[in-house]
């Protein structure tokens, strides 16, 4: 009887210990969903940018989820779940989308594509973190594409991982002046009704070229939906500039380049807009674009960049300076979640958003696909870049200014 009682007590202790062990380990084996929202343009002339961003986000999330997921504050494993919204590159729709996202379980939103959406959208966010008198949305937005200069400073909740075009074109024109000292004049062309194109010509290219010693001999303007460029190219032909600097997106860039070829306008060099360093440009007018030079913050020059490009291709997308930022954004969000005690529970959504915002604001550097990215106090990025040129309907690295 004593032996039986002892065995029973031992069994009870064993079961109690096992139960306790099970309870303690369950927190570590549990899996939670971390909701992420993506948004951008998937309709209209520039829809390829949003489509590629969605493909990259899917690829990056699949990679993380299939390689261990994300470690949460209590040791549980988190798996990302993406919901992507089309804002149609319209400010009012972008604002509506983000208000909708704020009412979901998403802890962060990655987007938008268009600067004309980002600028007013950032304006509806709380301007200063912790300001009780400001009823603006307290939702971290981490932009991958909208590139117009200086937008992140609008709100403490706005962050961007986009290249600094002012630095890129300043360096490019200075380098071109050294490499081609015989070239003296520049003619500019701009997609006047698109915020990014307009800003980059008037505030960046038009400033950087004369600063490097070039003489500006004229400019031409057109609209995003234009299909005829006869008049603009005639003006280029008349100016006889050594360099044509084009600030427009792939659709109108190709239209312009084809018209230049038709009118036999052959400048010594053509400089393009960052956003046109994409496969869409080469697919639309590879022969006409031959030789165009564009600064870009993405090229498949590292193992990480090639890996991201391959995984994106599996999702039906292509990787360029915009969509590559979306991959980096997901990796940065994972890093911030793991370092800042995110719980990913239904009752911690707003607290998690605040922790992610604070974590992003605290970053000084992040790991990029082609090198280290510096973070600024205003929530912007200072990204490494190279000069790419179109060669045989492919993008090739012409020069790496870091080397």
Identify the residue ranges that each predicted region occupies.
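Periplasmic-binding protein-like
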Residues: 101-114, 134-144, 186-190, 240-250, ...
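Extracellular/periplasmic periplasmic-binding protein-like sensory domains
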Residues: 260-329, 339-340, 390, 395-402
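Extracellular/periplasmic bilobed ligand-binding domains
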Residues: 123-131, 201-297, 399
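An alpha-beta-alpha
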Residues: 42, 154-221, 243
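Segments of small-molecule ligand-sensing domains
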Residues: 313-323, 334-399
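Hydrophobic alpha-helical segments within soluble ligand-binding/sensing domains
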Residues: 94, 160-185, 229-230, 253-254, ...
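Beta-alpha junction/loop-to-helix N-cap segments that form part of ligand/metal-binding clefts
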Residues: 48-55, 70-151, 161, 222-229, ...
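Extracytoplasmic "Venus flytrap"
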Residues: 37-60, 85-91, 190-200, 318-324
């Amino acid at each position: 009887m004593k032996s039986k009682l002892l065995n029973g007590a031992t069994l009870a202790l064993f079961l109690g210990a096992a139960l306790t062990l099970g309870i303690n380990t369950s927190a570590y084996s549990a899996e939670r969903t971390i909701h992420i929202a993506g948004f951008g343009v998937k309709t209209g002339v520039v829809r390829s940018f949003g489509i590629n961003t969605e493909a990259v986000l899917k690829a990056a999330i699949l990679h993380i989820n299939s390689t261990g997921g994300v470690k949460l504050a209590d040791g549980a494993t988190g798996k990302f779940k993406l919901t992507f919204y089309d804002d149609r590159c319209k400010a009012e729709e972008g604002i509506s989308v983000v208000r909708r996202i704020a009412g979901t379980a998403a802890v962060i939103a990655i987007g938008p594509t268009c600067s004309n959406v980002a600028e007013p959208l950032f304006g509806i966010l709380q301007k200063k973190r912790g300001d009780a008198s400001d009823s603006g949305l307290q939702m971290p937005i981490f932009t991958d594409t909208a590139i117009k200069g200086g937008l992140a400073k609008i709100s403490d909740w706005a962050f961007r991982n986009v290249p600094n075009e002012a630095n890129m074109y300043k360096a490019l024109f200075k380098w071109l002046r050294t490499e081609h000292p015989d070239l003296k004049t520049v003619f500019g062309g701009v997609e006047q009704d698109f915020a990014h194109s307009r800003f980059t010509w008037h505030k960046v290219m038009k400033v950087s070229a004369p600063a490097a010693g070039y003489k500006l001999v004229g400019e031409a303007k057109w609209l995003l939906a234009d299909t005829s460029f006869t008049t603009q190219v005639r003006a280029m032909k008349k100016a006889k500039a050594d360099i044509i600097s084009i600030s427009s997106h792939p659709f109108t860039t190709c239209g312009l380049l084809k018209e230049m070829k038709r009118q036999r306008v052959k400048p010594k060099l053509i400089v393009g807009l960052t956003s046109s360093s994409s496969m869409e440009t080469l697919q639309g007018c590879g022969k006409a674009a031959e030789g165009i030079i564009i600064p870009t913050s993405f090229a498949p020059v590292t193992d990480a960049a090639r890996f991201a490009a391959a995984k994106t291709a599996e999702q039906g997308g292509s990787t360029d300076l915009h969509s590559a930022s979306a991959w980096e954004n997901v990796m940065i969000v994972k890093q911030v979640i793991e370092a800042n005690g995110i719980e990913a529970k239904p009752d911690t959504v707003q607290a998690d958003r605040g922790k992610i915002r604070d974590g992003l604001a605290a970053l000084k550097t992040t790991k990029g696909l082609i090198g280290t990215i510096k973070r600024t106090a205003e929530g912007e990025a200072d990204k490494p870049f190279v000069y790419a040129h179109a060669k045989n309907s492919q993008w090739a690295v012409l020069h790496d200014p870091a080397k």
